[in-house]
Amino acid sequence: MNAGKLILGFSVALAACGSGNKTEKETLPSVDDYQEVAIFNGDSAYMHVAAQVEMGPRVPGSVGHARCLDYITGTFRRYGADTVVEQAFTAEAHTGEVLGLTNVVARYNAAAPRRILIGAHWDTRPWGDMDETREGRSTPIPGANDGGSGVGVILEIARVLQHMPPAIGVDLVLFDGEDYGRSSSWSNDEETWCLGSQYWKSNNGYGGKDARPDYAVVLDMVGGKGARFHREVSSDIHASEVVDRVWDMARSSGYGDTFVNSAGGHIIDDHLSINRAGIPAIVVIESLNQKTNSFNPTWHTHQDDLSAIDRKSLKAVGQTMVNLIYEEGGQAAKQ
C-alpha cells in the first residue's frame, strides 16, 4: 500500500557567511511560523476500497462481512486509535431475518473535552435491485462506492490522525446494516434502513465523562467518477451550520467545484439517527449525478465495482475532512 506521507513544516537555521561590513541581517522564520501539514492520500484510501471489494460483498452474515470486520478493527488498532469498540447486536430486517450486526467506533484523543464524529456505513446491499438483469437484482453487489468508499476515506483519516494527533477528539464510527432496507416505498419504510445507526442512537455511550460530539458528518457514496456533492435537504433542515462549515472548508481547500453550494436530494441515511440522538449531523453524498439527476449510475447495481471509484473524489472528501479536523483544533492543516 502506498500509505502516503505526513509532511511537517520546519525551519532550518542558517549560519550567515559574509563580510563583517554587512549591515542587514536576513530575517528567517521561526519554527512557530510554520504549520503542520496533514496530507490525505487518495491512493491509500483507494487501496482500502480495493481491499474491501476483494473480500466480496459485505452482506451481514457473509464471509466477506466477517473478513471486513476484522480488517476494519485491525486497521484502526494499527493506526493507533485510543479505543476500538465493536458494538455487536441483533436486528430484525424487513425480510424477517434476524441479523447479527456490529458497529465499530474508533476514538482518537478520547480525553478531549470537545470532539466531532465522522461516520459511514460498512455493509453492502444484499441485492442489486437497480441492476438491469434479473440475476443481478437478486444477488449481492460489490459495493465499492456504496459502502466501500466511505470506509476507505475514514481508514485513511485514521492514518493521518495517528501521525498528527488532533487537538480535539475525533470519533470515527462505521455503522452496520445501513443498506438492508426495503426499496419499494422510500418514505414509508425509513425504519427498514440504517439499522446500525438506529441501534447506536440509543446506545452510543455519550454521557458522564464522555463528551457528546459538537456535530457529525456522514460519508456515503463519496468515491464516484467525477462525483459532485450537493447540500442534502434534511442536513440543511437540521444542521445547516454544519453544512456551511463543511462546504466552506471544501471551498477553501480547493474543492468548491466538487462541493456544490446548492440543494441536492432528500436522503435516508445514518445522519438521521445521529440527529435524533441530539447531535447535529449531515451527510455528504452524491445525490444529483449529471447523468441520472439522482444517485451515481452504479447505485445498487453490479457495476458498483472498483472501476467505479475515482481517487480524486476520495481525495477531495478526505482532504476536506482532514482540514476540518485540524481547523477545529486550531492546528490549521493545509493541503
Residue ranges and their predicted role:
Residues 31-39, 53-63, 91-93, 137-147, ...:
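Second-shell loop/turn segments in exported
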Residues 14-16:
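C-terminal motif of bacterial Sec signal peptides marking the signal peptidase cleavage site
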Residues 138-241, 266, 271:
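Acidic/histidine-rich catalytic neighborhood of metal-dependent amide-processing enzymes
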Residues 58-60, 90-93, 110-112, 122-126, ...:
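Solvent-exposed loop/turn segments at secondary-structure junctions
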Residues 22-69, 79, 293-308:
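N-terminal capping segment at the start of a domain
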Residues 215, 222-335:
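Active-site-adjacent substrate-binding region
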Residues 51-111:
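A non-catalytic alpha/beta surface segment that caps or lines the substrate-entry region
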Residues 2-9:
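Sec-dependent signal peptide recognition
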